[in-house]
From Swiss-Prot:
Keyword field contains Iron: no
Lineage: Archaea, Methanobacteriati, Methanobacteriota, Stenosarchaea group, Methanomicrobia
Record-stated family: Belongs to the MtxX family.
The protein's name: Putative methyltransferase mtx subunit X
Gene Ontology molecular function terms on file: methyltransferase activity
Keyword set includes Nucleotidyltransferase: no
Gene3D superfamilies reported for this sequence: Isopropylmalate Dehydrogenase
Enzyme class of the recorded protein, top EC level: transferase
Source species, domain of life: Archaea
Keywords for the protein's UniProt record, in alphabetical order: Methyltransferase, Transferase
SUPFAM superfamilies referenced in this protein's UniProt entry, alphabetically: Isocitrate/Isopropylmalate dehydrogenase-like (SSF53659)
Record text on subunit structure and interactions: May be part of a complex composed of 3 subunits; MtxA, MtxH and MtxX.
Length: 280
């Protein structure tokens, strides 16, 4: 897994994709992180936001002037005027709703890539608060996530989490349900040819043996993401929406640094191009 980041960086530099980044309430740190991605050769970055606000801070990057970056990001992506897009500091709900409408999607499925404090990379799903709330949702995420992880040259090892230890059965109905769901989901994934194991609530054990952590639901997944990226000394590279025809990487506005998310988007764009060559 440690070689994963090197592979992502190499593919980003080979591709140097045209990557759009949503901008709201720009600040020097945000614009500097976008500029750094371009200087490092990861991408040609296009800022999408209010040009007057951006110009007050100053940047040499290309700017698409709009007061509605949430909508324009999707338009640029669908029209192929950019190779990939990241949410940046655009609003989450507006960006994702516009993306779903533009692409005719009923729901989105995201797979976050994080680094622990000791720089161990791993994938995490679900991360949206409204995602992964049913067994069917979790299985869909595992199947799609495993497929995309393999495209990066990594064999997925799934660690399924639940709300307690096996010895906690009978203490609480909700905990009992998550334990039963965890057992079923892990067994079903195994039956589909995906290496998976139910680790109950023991995330500290799961991270030692797995590279793809599946949280009990989207709320707990979002909390895991925020704890690692914003409190625990780790980092979040972004959460790509799992789809075949376009590359969109969701990001959190909190951290303010987007260099690695741009790198990831450019690398995924490269992989999509290579995959299309094989299909043809």
């Amino acid at each position: 897994m440690y070689a994963l980041l090197e592979a992502i960086e190499a593919r980003a530099r080979m591709n140097r994709a045209r990557v759009a980044m949503g901008i709201r309430d720009p600040n020097p740190k945000t614009l500097e992180s976008a500029w750094r991605a371009q200087v490092l050769g990861y991408a040609q970055v296009v800022l999408v936001g209010d040009k007057k606000e951006i110009d007050r801070i100053g940047t040499d990057l290309e700017v698409v002037d709009t007061k509605d970056p949430e909508k324009v990001l999707s338009e640029l992506l669908v029209s192929r005027k950019v190779d990939a897009a990241i949410r940046g500091t655009a609003k989450a709900s507006g960006t994702l709703s516009n993306l779903k409408e533009a692409l005719g999607m009923k729901r989105v499925c995201r797979l976050a890539l994080l680094l622990t404090a000791d720089e161990t990379p791993f994938f995490l799903a679900p991360v949206g608060i409204d995602e992964g709330n049913t067994i069917a949702d979790k299985l869909r995420m595992i199947i799609l996530g495993a497929e995309h992880i393999r495209r990066l040259g990594v064999e997925p090892v799934v660690g399924v989490l639940s709300g307690g230890r096996i010895g906690d059965l009978g203490r609480d109905r909700r905990v009992d349900r998550t334990l039963a769901d965890g057992e079923f989901v892990a067994a079903r994934a195994l039956g589909l040819g995906i290496n998976a194991k139910h680790y109950t609530i023991l995330i500290e054990d799961a991270i030692k043996e797995s590279n793809f952590i599946v949280a009990p639901d989207g709320i707990s997944g979002n909390l895991i993401f925020r704890t690692i990226a914003f409190l625990g000394g780790g980092d979040g590279l972004g959460a790509p929406v799992l789809m075949d025809d376009y590359v969109f990487v969701d990001t959190s506005r909190v951290g303010g640094h987007f260099t690695k998310a741009i790198m990831l988007a450019s690398a995924l764009s490269y992989l999509h191009k290579e995959r299309k060559k094989v299909i043809r």
